[in-house]
Amino acid sequence: DCPSGWSSYEGHCYKPFKLYKTWDDAERFCTEQAKGGHLVSIESAGEADFVAQLVTENIQNTKSYVWIGLRVQGKEKQCSSEWSDGSSVSYENWIEAESKTCLGLEKETGFRKWVNIYCGQQNPFVCEA
């Protein structure tokens, strides 16, 4: 069972927040919202579609991006081997860009594709627990 106001998909709970925060602040915020909470980790195309729908319905007219729980470690295009909640990255769906370090969902792709964004940018986000 998900906390009130959260949506369920395959045993996990999700909640989009229309609060503009940096990646680090958003991740910290998610850990405070629910037991086991983190920025969303997208591990299948089905989950990607579910999250895209959730964002589209709940975070209207965001400028462009929505944080997910993935950041690039180091200067190379070396993706972190795990999501912020510790789960490993097996599903990937991002747009190549110059090295920026944190990943967000891009509005132009219906919040389905991932794009590298500067981690200090303030964006809405989705928490998962």
From Swiss-Prot:
PROSITE patterns according to UniProt: C_TYPE_LECTIN_1, C_TYPE_LECTIN_2
SMART domains: CLECT
GO annotations of cellular component type: extracellular region
Cell location: Secreted
Positions annotated to bind Ca(2+): S41, E43, E47, E128
Entry GO MF terms: calcium ion binding; toxin activity
Major location (coarse): secreted
InterPro entries to which the protein is assigned, alphabetical: C-type_lectin-like, C-type_lectin-like/link_sf, C-type_lectin/snaclec_domain, C-type_lectin_CS, CTDL_fold
Domain of life: Eukaryota
PANTHER family, per database record: MANNOSE, PHOSPHOLIPASE, LECTIN RECEPTOR RELATED
Family listed: Belongs to the snaclec family.
Function: Anticoagulant protein which binds to the gamma-carboxyglutamic acid-domain regions of factor IX (F9) (but not factor X) in the presence of calcium with a 1 to 1 stoichiometry.
Oligomeric form and interacting partners: Heterodimer of subunits A and B; disulfide-linked.
UniProt-recorded name of the protein: Snaclec coagulation factor IX-binding protein subunit A
